[in-house]
Amino acid sequence: MEQPMKPTVIITGASSGVGLYGAKALIDKGWHVIMACRNLDKTQKVADELGFPKDSYTIIKLDLGYLDSVRRFVAQFRELGRPLKALVCNAAVYFPLLDEPLWSADDYELSVATNHLGHFLLCNLLLEDLKACPDADKRLIILGTVTANSKELGGKIPIPAPPDLGNFEGFEAGFKKPIAMINNKKFKSGKAYKDSKLCNMLTTRELHRRFHQETGIVFNSLYPGCVADTPLFRNHYSLFRTIFPWFQKNVTKGYVSQELAGERVAMVVADDKFKDSGVHWSWGNRQQAGREAFVQELSEQGSDAQKAQRMWDLSEKLVGLV
């Protein structure tokens, strides 16, 4: 008897950290994972090391900092002929030590280009694929961060600066080099990351508003906890990479392992408990065994309907959708 096709999920940044262990958890649940990554050899190596069954994953190149790469990825995925049941926008870059911005292939500031604009285009292009999937329970999940949400303790820390999108003056002006900040003010690398993640959460809100009722697709964001040893911090001071995990494990008790964070991502993708759309899931930044997820309130900016609509309209122009 022919075996039914495994449900398919795309995970960006699945070669390390939360994305990799989210892929593992979903493979263990019987899913087929499209590992969307920049480095194909590295991705194959970690898939082999974790013992992923060969029929449980497909690796496709994706560089979110290059909009043409996003379009090529979507075309390559469609060649597989697999119905898309879920999309997880996990990949992110963080450059906390930069005094001057890095630029994407499209001449956008690299962290906003990768974390927000690349994912924004990917979500929009793959909406048709999610709609076409015959499964009734389809989900699009974007990872947020505590540092972009002032309703959580980690989001109240003012260093280097809190997220502030202004009125999107930088986006309005075209956001091309030398404009490096969404509000068109002086470049601050850590703030650029926070701004990009705030845009991620606004994107989730606007996806829900525009498409949930029509399509039934579940649109959510989540914060799986403080993964203090994540490769996201690879561009930070080596001393920070040593002290921060120790501090989270022994002082705040907020440390969450990459494995547990990946399991939490898989839960939001696959479990019936997480079928509500338009919410931000959190575990309260704690490792405790059996800790339950809850719907976390977002900041005023992250809950601002007008800001979400303006972000959407300007982002559509920046990625060439209009």
Swiss-Prot record:
Pathway per its UniProt entry is: Porphyrin-containing compound metabolism; chlorophyll biosynthesis
- Which InterPro entries does the record match to this protein? NAD(P)-bd_dom_sf (IPR036291), Prochl_reduct (IPR005979), SDR_fam (IPR002347)
A GO MF annotation of the entry reads:
protochlorophyllide reductase activity
Q: List UniProt keywords, sorted A-Z.
A: Chlorophyll biosynthesis, NADP, Oxidoreductase, Photosynthesis
Pfam family for this entry, one:
adh_short
Give the EC class as a word.
Answer: oxidoreductase
Membrane-traversing stretches: none
Give the EC number(s) under which this enzyme is classified.
1.3.1.33
Q: Catalyzes what?
A: chlorophyllide a + NADP(+) = protochlorophyllide a + NADPH + H(+)
Name of the protein this chain belongs to: Light-dependent protochlorophyllide reductase
- Native source species: Synechocystis sp. (strain ATCC 27184 / PCC 6803 / Kazusa)
